[in-house]
Amino acid sequence: MLKNVYIVGGNGFARECYYNLLRMQKSDSSIQFGGFLGHGGYGHTVDYKDLQKYYVGEVSEHVFKENEYVVIGAGYPELRQKIYADLKKINVKFFTVYVGENLPDSVEIGEGNILAPPFLCSCNIKIGNANVFNGDVVVGHDSVVGDCNFFGPRSQVLGNVKIGDFNQIGANVILLPKCKIGNGNKIAPLSAVYKGCRNNSYWAGNPAVKIGNNE
């Protein structure tokens, strides 16, 4: 059965999702691109540049069919959370973007994730829903990732790390073994987190220290 996949969102990240879908199509002919859908003003008629012709309207105007799925084409955790929650209310089915070899059997992964290539992971990992691993991200053994997190390019989650929800992990960040990250945090690029952080804070440096709140 064909899977008609829509991308909800706009700007550069939605376009990146489109090209990763094209990569997936090369090995799975059941995947078809339905078009771009806006969400509450995010994603509209000026956001898609050379892909503008694929914009088909707003989510609120679209009636989803049985074979239709959604990719959340937004990077920021707060926006992903909002789109994910709104679409769950109308029972939309979510599509996970993954270009690569089969994941190990011991990896548990939820719905609506984006695993941009290359994505490298070890074993006994749990990943929740609607996360973004935005290229060359490494996740180590026995790590747990919640929902709606963003991992910047070349970030590394080492073994036994626990991560909550709605965190923004910058490019080239290293989360060292057994550290614990709460909810709603922002970690600046190139930072190294040794023990972890609680909730709604902003961290930077090596070793990373709290430099403010993420409100």
Predicted regions located by residue number:
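Generic structural signal for conserved hydrophobic packing positions in ordered secondary structure
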Residues: 9, 70, 94, 140-141
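Short amphipathic alpha-helical segments
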Residues: 18-20, 82-86, 198-199, 215
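A solvent-exposed beta-alpha-beta segment
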Residues: 1-74
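Compact structured core domains
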Residues: 55-108, 112-122
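Structural signal for interior beta-strand "rungs" in well-ordered beta-sheet cores
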Residues: 96-211
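Flexible, glycine-rich phosphate/dinucleotide-binding loops
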Residues: 14, 42-43, 79, 103, ...
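A general structural motif
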Residues: 1-3, 31-33, 65-67, 91, ...
